[in-house]
Design a protein with these regions (language model features):
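Conserved pre-ATP/AMP-binding loop-to-beta segment of ANL
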Residues: 15-16, 105-119, 139, 149-156, ...
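Adenylate-forming
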Residues: 187, 201-239
């Protein structure tokens, strides 16, 4: 079962179950799936035709340049649905670098197994493209979700752009399980705490730097939290 087929299954079985909450906006599994099907190509994104560099069934890369978390997610899923190889650009990437990224991809091509692309964080320089097959994620989701105790009843709070691999993997993994993702564009830890309490969040996924901010600003016990998952960086003794 593909990621899109899994979402269709939830739309058919539990269309009114909440899939995503962004601040006060709630999106059900039915609404999310319908948004994927009804979406049309957005000219803020860019299609790179791989031509003779890729003789596989997928030969077009979709560079997604949306800033909104919802738009990033829906366009990424739409790209999978339409047979593109979607890749979400980091919000801070400038036009010059996106142009260079597009040039490199068009010249070097992508592996024939690729279903989507991800970008490195760019901490050692400019972000670099990496390529993944859908099966490399979805075949591990059940194991991953079991390790992190993620299931259909999970309410997970996370913060960051969908362009970051850890965030996108966690979001799709939670949706695969039928759970609910809660996020915000706000950089204020007090806002994060408010959402965690309002929606009875039981999981948090965040970089240790953001966990430190959360700990620093949280003056009371968050009783609903059962699991905290740190992403990409080493947790220090203080945390």
């Amino acid at each position: 079962m593909t990621i899109i087929e899994r979402l269709q299954q939830y739309k058919d079985l539990e269309p009114h179950k909440i899939a995503l909450i962004v601040d006060e906006e709630q999106y059900t599994y039915g609404q999310l799936y319908d948004a994927i099907l009804s979406m049309e190509f957005n000219n803020t994104s860019r299609v790179i035709n791989l031509g003779h560099f890729n003789d596989g069934p997928k030969n077009k890369v979709l560079l997604i340049q949306q800033l909104s978390f919802v738009d990033q997610l829906v366009q990424w899923l739409w790209g999978l649905y339409k047979g593109y190889i979607p890749m979400v650009c980091h919000n801070e990437m400038d036009v010059a670098y996106i142009d260079e990224l597009a040039r490199v991809i068009s010249v070097e091509g992508v592996p024939t197994y690729a279903d989507f692309g991800v970008l490195t964080s760019g901490t050692t320089g400019r972000p670099k493209p990496l390529w993944r097959s859908e099966s490399s994620w979805r075949e591990f989701f059940d194991t991953q979700n079991n390790i992190f105790h993620i299931n259909k009843d999970t309410n997970i709070f996370l913060h960051g752009s969908f362009s970051f691999t850890g965030v996108s993997n966690m979001v799709i993994g939670v949706l695969w399980s039928g759970g609910t993702v809660i996020t915000t564009s706000s950089l204020r830890p007090n806002r994060w705490i408010q959402l965690i309490e309002t929606y009875h969040v039981d999981h948090i996924y965040a970089l240790p730097t953001k966990l430190r901010l959360l700990v620093r600003h949280c003056k009371r016990k968050l009783d609903s939290i059962n699991y905290i998952i740190g992403g990409s960086q080493v947790l220090d003794r203080q945390l």
